[in-house]
């Protein structure tokens, strides 16, 4: 797949939305939607999460993945898709299997992803409790992670309000679809490797789209993140961060489905450096994956389907959609069980049946 260095992801100031005058706030929302429509990605500064908070979670990121394998395995993700919590070793996930999911295709070739990860949900989730490492192995880990999760949850809600406002909808239009908190926070570590040890076709993460609403990403300066140019399918260009506090926001599949492709979930990947003469450095990132309520449908909403236009997606719950992709990612054929809706699950807004 080709690469092009010409394109750039725009950077917006979130303070305009949170603290600006009404005209400035609304202008930000329109520009945000324009960025997401054109690239599916945007960088945001002054988002409300301090540099100190971000640095703390990166410290915990490095500490966790530097633990002995036996210590990380105490919080192990199961071999199958569920519960999607805890530590996944290098090669356990295979995102190449879900690359063409929306096209009704399933990849028969597994691409080896060179990363390990740790997944966490909300502090209270009766269906999927979090899996924590032992306190004595990494003191303070749980406190830092739970606090950072809550900070990201707040920003996720604000971003959804800004997107809705940019479409001239009620600010709560999208947050009403996410009233049950099921989002996930992930630590990623891409181990340093010597080029001679790499498998053919290996990537740090294969081409994929994110499953949920929007993703909030923080990354170090090592580089490697690339996104697909929507005007030139198959062509990717790099997205770097000048500092860890830069928050990269990208649209997930659920927003694409709700808007009937008015905003697209852009394919992205993490590649290895082209110059492989020396040891390839470790890379670290932190991602918050916003998710809808589990019982919420992720089919097109009437607010985004013009008269005479057909919905492009059939009705499916956010839960089932997420599970189908997870089962492919972890390589299992387990049955997808739909949970009973909790009393807090919202009923949906303007859903086309």
UniProtKB/Swiss-Prot annotation:
Domain Fe2OG dioxygenase: 181-292
BP GO terms, sorted: small molecule biosynthetic process
Sites where the protein binds 2-oxoglutarate: 283
Named cofactor requirement(s): Fe(2+)
Pathway named in the protein's UniProt entry: Secondary metabolite biosynthesis
InterPro entries assigned to the protein according to its UniProt record, in alphabetical order: DIOX_N (IPR026992), IPNS-like_FE2OG_OXY (IPR044861), IPNS-like_sf (IPR027443), Iron_ascorbate_oxido_reductase (IPR050231), Oxoglu/Fe-dep_dioxygenase_dom (IPR005123)
Catalytic activity annotation: L-proline + 2-oxoglutarate + O2 = trans-4-hydroxy-L-proline + succinate + CO2; L-proline + 2-oxoglutarate + O2 = trans-3-hydroxy-L-proline + succinate + CO2; D-proline + 2-oxoglutarate + O2 = cis-4-hydroxy-D-proline + succinate + CO2
Function: 2-oxoglutarate-Fe(II) type oxidoreductase; part of the gene cluster that mediates the biosynthesis of pyrrolopyrazines, secondary metabolites showing insecticidal activity. Within the pathway, ppzD converts L-proline into trans-4-hydroxy-L-proline as a major product, yielding a key precursor for peramine biosynthesis. PpzD is also able to convert L-proline into trans-3-hydroxy-L-proline.
Family: Belongs to the iron/ascorbate-dependent oxidoreductase family.
Name under which the protein is recorded: 2-oxoglutarate-Fe(II) type oxidoreductase ppzD
Gene of this entry: ppzD
